[in-house]
């Protein structure tokens, strides 16, 4: 009898342990797969591609790669003497046409005062037409002067905002063309996180919800707030042929990969460039409020930690 009870007890304990283990594994799996989190997140920032508006030789480079610069600080300078001469030439043209316009204005005024009693109507009209032509030439010369002045000002390339110079690839003596990107500027205090959430987890993601961001390779947890969720992503399963007909890719009905949707998260505190734009992180959306770690069970703490490793 005792042997039977002992065997029954062992069997019952084993069954209970198996059931508990199954429940724990099931809960862990649900928590792992359905809670709003992702390891596919990246730090991002506002980046300005700086390109000159004029062409010419670079005469001076005032910054070095990865330098923190202030708004308005000179980055590099392009061939100012050439554009200074162009401005002087345009100013000389303006001065010439101003004198010529004054002369033609006086001539036309004199003929208009004398009238047809002293000369023919054709001569009066001709003087007025010449005056109008000179005035148009003067306006054109003034526009050319203003453009030359603008070009001269734009030979000095300045930082459009506070930030870090990155990927600087210009050097003194190098010829640069108008519109070619010379350097990128990562704006200071513009960092945010783009978390690519699976569509199955978007139920728990709403603007205003709190989020935890853990940079890859770091134990530091940053706080943030969900700013927005992308309104759409590219449909990779459907394209159009050259006749405009829809082309649908074949797929396996029992294998469906969840689409990833970008979620923008604003950081509570800017971290400067400790984690540069493009580096990866793990993001957990905790809901309307921050997670209270003191209330977490051992299981939840382990689950949060395991998510760092995928």
UniProtKB/Swiss-Prot annotation:
InterPro entries: CusB-like_dom_1 (IPR043602), CusB_D23 (IPR032317), MFP_Efflux_Pump (IPR050393), PHBA_efflux_pump_AaeA (IPR022871), RND_pump_MFP (IPR006143). SUPFAM superfamilies: HlyD-like secretion proteins. Gene3D superfamilies: 2.40.30.170, 2.40.50.100. Pfam families: CusB_dom_1, HlyD_D23. Its main location: membrane. Keywords: Cell inner membrane, Cell membrane, Membrane, Transmembrane, Transmembrane helix, Transport. It is found in: Cell inner membrane. Induction: Positively coregulated with aaeB and aaeX by AaeR. One of its GO terms (molecular function) is transmembrane transporter activity. The chain crosses the membrane at residues 12-32. It is a single-pass membrane protein. Disulfide bonds: none annotated. Signal peptide: none annotated. GO terms for cellular component: plasma membrane. Forms an efflux pump with AaeB. Belongs to the membrane fusion protein (MFP) (TC 8.A.1) family. PANTHER family: P-HYDROXYBENZOIC ACID EFFLUX PUMP SUBUNIT AAEA, P-HYDROXYBENZOIC ACID EFFLUX PUMP SUBUNIT AAEA-RELATED. This is p-hydroxybenzoic acid efflux pump subunit AaeA. It comes from Escherichia coli O8 (strain IAI1).
């Amino acid at each position: 009898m005792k042997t039977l009870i002992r065997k029954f007890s062992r069997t019952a304990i084993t069954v209970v342990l198996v059931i508990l283990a199954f429940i724990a594994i099931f809960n862990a799996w649900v928590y792992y797969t359905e809670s709003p989190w992702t390891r596919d997140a990246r730090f991002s920032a506002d980046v300005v591609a700086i390109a000159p508006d004029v062409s010419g030789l670079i005469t001076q480079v005032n910054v070095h790669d990865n330098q923190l610069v202030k708004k308005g600080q000179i980055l590099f300078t392009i061939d100012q003497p050439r554009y200074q001469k162009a401005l002087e030439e345009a100013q000389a043209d303006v001065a010439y046409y101003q004198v010529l316009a004054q002369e033609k204005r006086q001539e036309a005024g004199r003929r208009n005062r004398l009238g047809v009693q002293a000369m023919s109507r054709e001569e009066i009209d001709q003087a007025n037409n010449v005056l109008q032509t000179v005035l148009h030439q003067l306006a054109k010369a003034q526009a050319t002067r203003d453009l030359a002045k603008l070009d001269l000002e734009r030979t000095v390339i300045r930082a459009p905002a506070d930030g870090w110079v990155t990927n600087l690839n210009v050097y003194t003596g190098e010829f640069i063309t108008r519109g070619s990107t010379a350097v990128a500027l990562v704006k200071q205090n513009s960092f945010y996180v783009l978390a690519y959430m699976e569509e199955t987890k978007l139920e728990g993601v709403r603007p205003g919800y709190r989020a935890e961001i853990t940079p890859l390779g770091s134990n530091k947890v940053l706080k943030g707030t969900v700013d927005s969720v992308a309104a759409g992503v590219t449909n990779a399963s459907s394209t159009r042929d050259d006749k405009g007909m829809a082309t649908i890719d074949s797929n396996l009905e029992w294998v469906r990969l969840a689409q990833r949707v970008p979620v923008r998260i604003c950081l509570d505190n800017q971290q400067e460039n400790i984690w540069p734009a493009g580096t990866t992180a793990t993001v957990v959306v905790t809901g309307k409020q921050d997670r209270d770690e003191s209330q977490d069970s051992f299981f939840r703490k382990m689950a949060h930690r395991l998510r760092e490793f995928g």
